[in-house]
Amino acid sequence: MTTQLEQAWELAKQRFAAVGIDVEEALRQLDRLPVSMHCWQGDDVSGFENPEGSLTGGIQATGNYPGKARNASELRADLEQAMRLIPGPKRLNLHAIYLESDTPVSRDQIKPEHFKNWVEWAKANQLGLDFNPSCFSHPLSADGFTLSHADDRIRQFWIDHCKASRRVSAYFGEQLGTPSVMNIWIPDGMKDITVDRLAPRQRLLAALDEVISEKLNPAHHIDAVESKLFGIGAESYTVGSNEFYLGYATSRQTALCLDAGHFHPTEVISDKISAAMLYVPQLLLHVSRPVRWDSDHVVLLDDETQAIASEIVRHDLFDRVHIGLDFFDASINRIAAWVIGTRNMKKALLRALLEPTAELRKLEAAGDYTARLALLEEQKSLPWQAVWEMYCQRHDTPAGSEWLENVRTYEKEILSRRG
């Protein structure tokens, strides 16, 4: 007997075929686009180095929803629960503060061995890993400067931390057979009017050059750098601005990270992708949702998320763009946050793959902007949801909101016991 889902799928195939779209091919392409989930949603960016310490660096996780992960075992269990509810290929993005060691480890001394449990777990779950040095929430970042610090000793500490992090990243790539993208973000900046804006940037330039001086196998490791407009306590001046890092990535041919929340509220990173791709070899995207500032709300299936996905698909950037998520909401169930945000990113990618782009390009080239707008709007109403539900079924994940019951059961049986 044909199920309702299968009936909807057959009808959707016909509707999309009528506008020249092969839905089976769209699903094959969707399986080429892993989304890198960020570990820090699971514990509000606490990490395991000093989990009781305060979060610094001009970022905030607001809320106090019960059940956050308190150690690596709990975090991995929570991730597994979330990943079971998300269809298709996934990766995990780790920060250096999520190391595991029986004794304290200085950040400039981190080694691959401190992340071996993560690698074994990734192998067991068929995941790639990405990495980040953690240049915040540390006594030597307390005055707001790290890689651009005027004190040579402190600056060298952070240089050494980033160099050690690159070796960890390369270890991930070598062990897992897929390159690890290591993103450098620093909180460096000033609260008020800054007289010398040049010297910190000169120091940052030299520091970054030292960080990436060790040649690593690009099949194992990819360097990325990330700008930001401002942070809490660094409202007036950010050393690592967009112009600084675009210039750096272009001149050094590293990847450039574009974070959806790291620009002026009227700017969108979807418009920056095609411009940056002319100059840099690869892009890392941190898909987020800024609400009036870099608030890192859970990603929605909104216009900007869709526009980001459409840029990747329309310009066939599958092999040059790495899709990561960056949000942390402590006011709702953290597993649900992962599931909602990651499923929304994948839905946006699917909708982009179901767009009749070739026809739209023809209309645009012919100057028929009326038809272009009409078709763009009409295709939003095509039955993409039926295609999504079949994709979920094929990946043995819940198709609709029934995933929430899985989360509620896990919350009742596991999270509620954490206090």
Curated annotation (Swiss-Prot):
| UniProt subcellular location | Cytoplasm
Q: Which UniProt keywords apply?
A: Cytoplasm, Isomerase, Manganese, Metal-binding, Rhamnose metabolism
Q: What gene is this protein translated from? A: rhaA
Question: What is the species listed in this Swiss-Prot or TrEMBL entry?
Answer: Escherichia coli O1:K1 / APEC
Lineage, uppermost ranks? Bacteria, Pseudomonadati, Pseudomonadota, Gammaproteobacteria, Enterobacterales
GO MF terms here are:
L-rhamnose isomerase activity; manganese ion binding
**Subunit details:** Homotetramer.
The UniProt similarity line reads: Belongs to the rhamnose isomerase family.
**Mind telling me what this protein is named?**
L-rhamnose isomerase
EC numbers listed for it are 5.3.1.14
Which chemical reaction does it catalyze? L-rhamnopyranose = L-rhamnulose
**Chief location category:** cytoplasm
In this chain, Mn(2+) is annotated as bound at 262, 294, 296
Q: What does this protein do?
A: Catalyzes the interconversion of L-rhamnose and L-rhamnulose.
